[in-house]
Amino acid sequence: MNKTVKYITAIGFLFTGLQTFAQKKDENIGTEVVNVVKPYTPTISDAFKVKETPVIDDETNTQKEEIKYNIFSFPVASTFTPAKGRAADVDKEAKERLFKNYATLGIGNYGTVNAELFVTQDLSNNDYVGGMFRHLSSQGGIDEVKLDDSYYNTALDITYGSRTREIDWNADLGYKHQMYNWYGLPTEFVPFNDDAINSINEDQTYQTLTLGAKLDVKEGMMDETPMLFKRFWDSHGSEENRFFIKPSFDFEVKEYKFKTEFVADYVGGSFEKDYLGVPDMSYSYLNFGVVPSILLQKDDLSVQAGAGFFYSRGIVNDITDDKIFVYPQIKASYKLVGDIMIAYAGAEGNLKQNSFADFVEENKFVSPTLAIAPTNQQYDIYVGLKGKLSNTVAFNVRGSYMAEDDKAFFTANPYETANPNTEGYVYGNSFGVVYDDLKTVSLFGELKMDFSKNVAFGINGTFNGYSTDQAEAWNLPSLKIGADLDVDITKKWYAGADIFFVGDRKDQFYYNDITLTEPLTKIVTLDSYFDLNAHVGYKHNERLTGFLKLNNIANQQYERWLNYPVQGFQVLLGANYKFDF
C-alpha cells in the first residue's frame, strides 16, 4: 500500500504545474478534404526527413519506449499533390534541402559500432527500389559479469514498389542476423567456481528471413492488404514459420460506412528439446478471424460498432485443440469543443498470436524451450479525453480495464545441478514463459508542448494495477514515467534529452543441488530504475552532420531482467552524411 501511495504521489508531482496531459501520437483529432489536381514525380525525400542522430536500443544498453514494427516498407511520396493556393507575400526562410539517401557511422565505448545505410532510386514516375542496412554491436565489458556480454545485430532489407492512380503495391525481402549471450548468472544465490563458469557455452544466434508485400487499391471496396512470411531459427536447433494475410473491404451507404476485416494467421515451429533435455517439442496455431463493423459519423459524433469472430486450431506435440472466440469491437468519440477537446471510449478485444520470434524480440535471453500459445485478449474497456489547450499544448488522458486469458509472462528459469541438459541456458541464466489470466487497471496521461518552433517538450506516465489468478504479474512494472526535450539551438546546433523511470518488478528463482537440505525458492524484487540520455549535433553543411550521444548518464547499473545488469555510462560519437545519386 505504501509503495502504491508513493507511485501515485510521483505521478502527481510530475504533472503538477503542467496542468494538462498530452495528445497521443497515433490519434487523429480532425480531418480535412483536399482536391488533387496534378501529378508529379515522387521522391523519397518528400515523405520523411532523415534522422541526424541514430538511436541505440538494445537489451544490454537501456530500456527504450515501446516501438511497434510493421512490414519493412520505404516511404515514398504520393504521385499526386493537392493544389496550392496563392498566399500573400511574406518573408520565408530558405527550406532545408532534402535528400533521398543517407549513411551513418558511430563508434563508442564498450566497443560499440552503429552503422546505417539507406538508399532509394526512382525507376520511373511510378516505380521505385530501395535498400537499408543496419548494424549495431558491442564488445561488452559490464562490471562483475562472469560470462561474455557482447552482442551484434545486423539487418538488410530490400524493397520494390509502384504507386499509380489506381493501385499502390510493394514487395520486401529482409534478412536479420543477431548474436547474444546468456551472461546473467545467478551469482547472488549460486557459488559458481571458475571451472563451472569456463564450461558454459553462453552464446545464442538468431536468424530471420522475411518476405512481405502490401497492396492498396485506390478505387473499389478493397482496402490495404498486408501479408508477411517469416522464417526464424537459432543456433540450438529451433525453427519457426509465420505467415499472415489481413485483407479488408468497405463500402458506404449514405452516412454509414460498412467495413469487414479478415485475418488468417499461422505460426508453427519446433524446439530441439525441452528444458530438461526431452527431445522434440512442436507446436502450430492457425487462426482465422472476421471482424465486421459499421461506422456512423454525424456532426461531432463518431461511432463504430462491430464484433470479432475467431476460430483457432492448435496442435502441441500432436495434441489438437479447437476454440472459438467472440470479441467486442466498439469505438466512439465526440467533439466536445470542435477539435480542441474530444472525448472517446471503446471496448475492444482480440486473439493475439504469440511466437518464438516475438518473444525473442522482447527478451533476447529466453531459452529455446518455450511453451507457445496465443493470448485471449477478452476485452479492453477504455475512456479518455484528448485535445489541445492552446496551439502549442496538446494532451491525452485515458483510463482502461483489460482482461486477458493466457497472458504470457517472462520468468527466470530454474537451476538444477542434476539437470541432464547441459546447454548454456540451464544455469539459471535464461528465461522461460508462463501463462496466467490477467486483469489490468491502467491510468495514462501524456502532455506535448512546443514552447517555440525550436523547443519541444513531452512527458507521459502510466500506472497499472494487476490482478492474476495463480501467481504474480512477473516482470511487469506498476509505474512507468518518461519525458523528452528537443532543442534547435541555432541553425547549426541542436540537442535533446530524455529520461524514463520504471518501477519495481518481481521475478522468481529456483535452485536445487544435492548439497542443499531443501531447494531454494525465492521471489525477487527488481529495483526501480531511471535512465537519463542526451545527444547534441552539429550540422556542418546540408549534407554532413556530426553527433555525440550519451546514454545512461547517471551510470545506473540497473537490471532490466533478473541477473542482467545493463551497460553503464555510454558515449557514441559519429556522423551522418546525406546524398543523392
What residue ranges belong to the model's regions?
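Outer-membrane beta-barrel transmembrane domain signature of Gram-negative proteins
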Residues: 203-212, 228-300, 432
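Flexible loop and strand-edge segments within Gram-negative outer membrane beta-barrel domains
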Residues: 138-151, 155, 172-224, 228-242
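Membrane-embedded beta-strands of outer-membrane beta-barrel proteins
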Residues: 117, 156-158, 211-215, 243-247, ...
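Outer-membrane beta-barrel translocator/receptor signature
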Residues: 83-85, 94-103, 107-144, 148-154
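Exposed, low-structure sequence patches enriched in small/polar residues
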Residues: 98, 103-106, 302-581
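N-terminal periplasmic/intermembrane-space "pro-region" immediately following the signal or transit peptide
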Residues: 22-93
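Surface-exposed extracellular loop regions of Gram-negative outer-membrane beta-barrel proteins
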Residues: 121-143, 261, 283-315, 450-465, ...
